[in-house]
UniProtKB/Swiss-Prot annotation:
Its EC number is 6.3.2.-. It comes from the Bacteria. Residues 104-287 form the ATP-grasp domain. The keyword Magnesium applies. Pfam families: RimK (PF08443), Rimk_N (PF18030). One of its GO terms (cellular component) is cytoplasm. Mn(2+) 2 binds at E260, N262. The lineage of its organism: Bacteria, Pseudomonadati, Pseudomonadota, Gammaproteobacteria, Pseudomonadales. Mg(2+) 2 binds at E260, N262. It comes from Pseudomonas syringae pv. tomato (strain ATCC BAA-871 / DC3000). Mn(2+) 1 binds at D248, E260. Binds 2 magnesium or manganese ions per subunit. Belongs to the RimK family. This is Probable alpha-L-glutamate ligase. Mg(2+) 1 binds at D248, E260.
Length: 301
């Protein structure tokens, strides 16, 4: 197979591993800088050009689209789909997952466990918003944030009001969530490929920190997930329409709660922690499922 990897940086661990795994299994792997691909949206003959030449003959495409280039990246991926190239994750599902609020709305409609979450526009509604998520302590999240950036833990209602007012004053969209104290600064990353959770790890925040992201100095360890956690991760990925996803789950007193569904989960943390060939499993999924004109929109957006 000829497989494209949409990635800004061929030296990133995840990109390198996917290329290695593909070559090991006998495929031709081509890394394409997402922002250097440009499109000819012609009737009956959609094309993508790259460094002066049309891209042709691809069987599958693996999108590794960073949050900052979501709009353009999804447009390039959509053009691949129009050309009949099989996407590991579809453009519509990636766009859906990048909108944190929409993601939670879709998951809640399907009855998947979530932390109580509030969203408001007017400063007049802040006191009621805080009550809605069971008061302080609570967590405030910027909707566009990634890797734990733009996430604030407010210990008191007064602090929460000040922070929410500040964000609103900056015209920054935020959501407010209940703080799950019993999780103890830890979450579980379940790595979903197809209809299986192929690997999972526990991420623990460093002392004095509540964000467990590895980019924020959190540590990762092996964990055995429960059948309920496994089912929650699979259902969350399915609702989002993602074939490959990193589903972040908190262990609460009332069962597993989904924090986020990541459409471009990093491979380094999960491979190093579990010693599993996750990249190889992703390529294997493409071998089994890809075919010309197999793009079908999944999920219920």
């Amino acid at each position: 197979m000829k497989i494209a990897v949409l990635s800004r940086n061929p030296r990133l661990y995840s990109t390198r591993r996917l290329v290695e795994a593909g070559i090991e299994r006998g495929h031709e792997m081509v890394v394409i800088d997402t922002l250097r691909a440009y499109m000819n949206i012609a009737s009956h003959k959609p094309q993508i050009h790259y460094r002066g030449k049309p891209l042709e003959g691809f069987d599958a495409v693996i999108p590794r689209i960073g949050a900052s280039v979501t709009f353009y990246g999804c447009a390039v991926l959509r053009q691949f789909e129009m050309m009949g190239v099989f996407p590991l994750n579809e453009s519509v599902a990636i766009a859906r997952s990048r909108d944190k609020l929409r993601s939670l709305q879709l998951l809640s409609r399907r009855g998947i466990g979530l932390p109580v979450t509030g969203f408001a526009h007017s400063p007049d509604d802040i006191p009621d918003l805080i009550q809605m998520v069971n008061g302080a302590p609570l967590v405030i999240k910027v909707l566009e944030g990634t890797q734990g950036i733009g996430v604030v833990l407010c210990e008191t209602a007064t602090a929460a009001e000040s922070v929410i007012e500040a964000f609103m004053g900056l015209k920054q969209d935020i959501m407010v969530q209940e703080y799950i104290k019993e999780a103890g600064g830890a979450d579980i990353r379940c790595f979903v490929v197809g209809d299986k959770v192929i690997a999972s790890m526990k991420r623990q925040a460093k002392p004095g920190e509540f964000r467990s992201n590895l980019h924020r100095g959190g540590s990762a360890s092996l964990i055995k997930i429960t059948p309920e956690e496994r089912m929650t991760a699979l259902r969350a990925a399915k609702v989002m329409g993602l074939s490959v996803a990193g589903v972040d789950i908190l262990r609460s007193n009332h069962g597993p709660l989904v924090m986020e569904v990541n459409s471009s989960p990093g491979l380094e943390g999960i491979e190093v922690t579990t010693s599993k060939d996750v990249a190889g499993m992703i390529i294997e999924y493409l071998e089994k499922n890809s075919g010309p004109h197999m793009t079908r929109t999944k999920g219920k957006g």
